[in-house]
């Protein structure tokens, strides 16, 4: 049996790093507010697919909607903490 992609980052006997988050599934036809979190190290689990998060980047909360391709990654991978450098014009 091959270890999954998630287990390459941590030892197999440790398992994935899971942070308990207040997850509520909305009833059909109802919307719930996005889950605000500073837990950038939380692993995205399959039951998070379709949920909306607001992940803290050190200054602001960045909106994030979880898709199937994100499963196994960390929440912090999808909210950049640094601004990209852009060459400015001289005044």
Swiss-Prot record:
GO terms for molecular function: RNA binding; structural constituent of ribosome. It is found in: Mitochondrion. It comes from the Eukaryota. Keywords: Mitochondrion, Ribonucleoprotein, Ribosomal protein. Coiled coil: none annotated. The keyword Ribosomal protein applies. The keyword Nucleus does not apply. PROSITE patterns: RIBOSOMAL_S19 (PS00323). HAMAP family: Ribosomal_uS19. Component of the mitochondrial small ribosomal subunit (mt-SSU). Mature N.crassa 74S mitochondrial ribosomes consist of a small (37S) and a large (54S) subunit. The 37S small subunit contains a 16S ribosomal RNA (16S mt-rRNA) and 32 different proteins. The 54S large subunit contains a 23S rRNA (23S mt-rRNA) and 42 different proteins. This is Small ribosomal subunit protein uS19m.
């Amino acid at each position: 049996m091959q270890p999954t992609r998630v287990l390459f980052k941590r030892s197999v006997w440790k398992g994935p790093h899971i942070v308990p988050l207040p997850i509520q599934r909305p009833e059909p036809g109802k919307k719930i507010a996005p889950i605000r979190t500073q837990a950038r190290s939380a692993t995205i689990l399959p039951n998070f697919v379709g949920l909306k998060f607001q992940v803290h980047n050190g200054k602001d909360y960045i909106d994030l909607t979880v898709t199937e391709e994100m499963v196994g990654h960390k929440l912090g991978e999808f909210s950049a903490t640094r601004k990209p450098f852009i060459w400015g014009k001289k005044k």
